[in-house]
């Protein structure tokens, strides 16, 4: 049975890695800039739908997996846990292949803890019910992944994004914090039925997943709910494609002496160039015209505005 469970996990790993590769051949939304991240989150959404809904239906139909999370479970529940092991391993490889360790260390720690705990149930055939309860967390991940896809598609200031943010917070409490609390309570009461190594492994997994879950909830609450304008768009410069502020050409010409006349320029333009002279500053009509074109209706130009976002 152990080899059979590992075979299912290996097949799941291959399938999800193939899905990562296959999505590269399909187009992504035009508004998405980080295409790899969008594909990665999309694959994660597929797994969350499969495992989260499967765990909810399984626990609803077989509540004995909650009353006896060590031994009592239907055979297909072990298959679902093995599929999740393959997914988390495939997702970890995908992150290592496309990101640096500094960028993905937190999720890699999460995946390592989850794979270690779930693979114990797959290999031993025990604690499958406990693992099924942990897969309820994927119901919250569905909302988190949808929110992330909207964010990557630059749909943050929208009704759909705000609904996904509220849904993420609600499901985080219902399907993430409550299951984690139940698992912690069960482990504290039934730890004598487990070996010391397994207890330490479960504690490490609960602490890792719990801390990441709490930090995620705080981040969504502060950025999406409490802020009036979450994730404002920063339009990029059309040519440089960077997020650096583009300086406006509002500089003036300082005159140190008395009045200066641009006789040479006036003669070249046939005497049609109006010269603005000042003891301190002088600005040509072309610069003034550039300012007027960039100003929005109803706003007043200030000479002190040196830069803006374009």
UniProtKB/Swiss-Prot annotation:
Location relative to the cell: Cell membrane
TM annotation in the entry: 6-26, 40-60, 79-99, 117-137, 167-187, 194-214
Keywords: Cell membrane, Membrane, Transmembrane, Transmembrane helix
UniProt xrefs under PROSITE patterns: TLC (PS50922)
Membrane topology type: Multi-pass membrane protein
GO cellular component: plasma membrane
TLC domain mapped to chain residues: 33-227
Cited InterPro entries: TLC-dom (IPR006634), TLCD (IPR050846)
Pfam families per UniProt: TRAM_LAG1_CLN8 (PF03798)
Keyword Kinase found: no
GO biological process: membrane assembly; phospholipid homeostasis; plasma membrane organization; regulation of membrane lipid distribution
Role, per record: Regulates the composition and fluidity of the plasma membrane. Inhibits the incorporation of membrane-fluidizing phospholipids containing omega-3 long-chain polyunsaturated fatty acids (LCPUFA) and thereby promotes membrane rigidity. Does not appear to have any effect on LCPUFA synthesis.
Family: Belongs to the TLCD family.
Protein's name according to its UniProt entry: TLC domain-containing protein 2
Organism field: Mus musculus (Mouse)
């Amino acid at each position: 049975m152990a080899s059979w469970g590992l075979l299912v996990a290996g097949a799941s790993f291959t399938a999800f890695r193939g899905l990562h590769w296959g999505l590269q051949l399909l187009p992504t939304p035009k508004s998405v800039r980080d295409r790899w991240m969008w594909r990665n989150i999309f694959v994660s959404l597929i797994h969350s739908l499969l495992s989260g809904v499967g765990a909810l239906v399984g626990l609803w139909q077989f509540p004995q997996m909650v009353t006896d999370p060590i031994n009592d479970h239907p055979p297909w529940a072990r298959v679902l846990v093995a599929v999740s092991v393959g997914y988390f391993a495939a997702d970890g490889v995908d992150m290592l292949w496309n990101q640096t360790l500094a960028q993905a260390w937190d999720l890699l720690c999460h995946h390592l803890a989850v794979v270690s705990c779930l693979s114990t149930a797959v290999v031993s055939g025990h604690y499958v019910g406990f693992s099924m309860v942990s897969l309820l967390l994927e119901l919250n991940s569905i909302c988190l992944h949808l929110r992330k896809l909207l964010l990557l598609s630059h749909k943050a200031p929208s009704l759909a994004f705000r609904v996904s943010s509220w849904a993420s917070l609600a499901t985080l409490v219902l399907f993430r914090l409550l299951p984690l609390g139940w698992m912690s309570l069960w482990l504290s009461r039934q730890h004598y039925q487990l070996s010391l190594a397994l207890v330490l492994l479960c504690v490490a997994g609960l602490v890792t997943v719990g801390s990441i879950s709490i930090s995620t909830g705080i981040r969504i609450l502060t950025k999406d709910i409490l802020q009036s304008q979450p994730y404002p768009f920063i339009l990029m410069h059309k040519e440089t494609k960077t997020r650096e502020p583009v300086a406006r050409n509002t500089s003036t010409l300082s005159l140190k002496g008395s009045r200066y006349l641009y006789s040479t320029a006036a003669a070249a333009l046939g005497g049609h160039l109006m010269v603005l002279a000042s003891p301190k500053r002088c600005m040509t009509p072309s610069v003034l015209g550039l300012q007027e074109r960039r100003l929005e209706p109803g706003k007043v130009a200030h000479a002190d505005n040196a830069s803006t976002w374009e």
